[in-house]
Amino acid sequence: MDKYEFNIKVEQIKKMVNKEDFATAMKIADTIDWRRVRNANLLSTISQVYEKNEQYQEAKEVLLLAFERAPIGKRFLYKLTELALKEGSIREAEDYYQEFCELAPEDTRQYILRYLILKEKRASQDQLIQALERYINAELDEKWMYELAELYAKAGRNDA
């Protein structure tokens, strides 16, 4: 495929993504060898296309390519952790989580990743609460505050 044809396909994919037609975007994406693409942001977009179509393995493979192109991308590690969890690969998610923590030890999102991993492992309510409390103590985020309140209710605690 020459550069002109590639650029046309990429533009088509972007149009489909903007229309939220991820199925068509994926059909176009399937015709491209993403290993030859160097643009990490484009690879990230393609990963999202596969994720929206619940093709988590493909999403992960493309996102790994993006991470190779931009190894300082903690955003990619965060997303790789999420994708591994969606795929049910807890061990792999923990590996990405560890890399994320090493790369960005001050990033409070590590507590969210920890919570998501614990949740996937079916950890105790107290462990889940502790992970979310650490995040909420650092960041005030309504979504996660609500989740924490639900955990308190399930655990029969009135801390909320």
Residue ranges and their predicted role:
Residues 45, 79, 113-114, 147:
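Canonical tetratricopeptide repeat
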Residues 20, 54, 88, 122-123, ...:
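Residue-level detector of the short coil/turn that links helix A to helix B
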Residues 5-35, 45, 51-52:
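Alpha-helical segment of the N-proximal tetratricopeptide repeat
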Residues 37, 71, 105-106, 139-140:
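Short coil turns that delineate tetratricopeptide repeat
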Residues 31-34, 64-68, 99-102, 133-137:
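Conserved structural position within tetratricopeptide repeats
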Residues 25, 59, 93, 127-128, ...:
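Single-residue signature of alpha-solenoid repeat helices
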Residues 16, 50, 84, 118-119, ...:
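Residue at a conserved register position within TPR or TPR-like alpha-solenoid repeats
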Residues 7, 41, 75, 109-110, ...:
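Start-of-helix register in tetratricopeptide repeats
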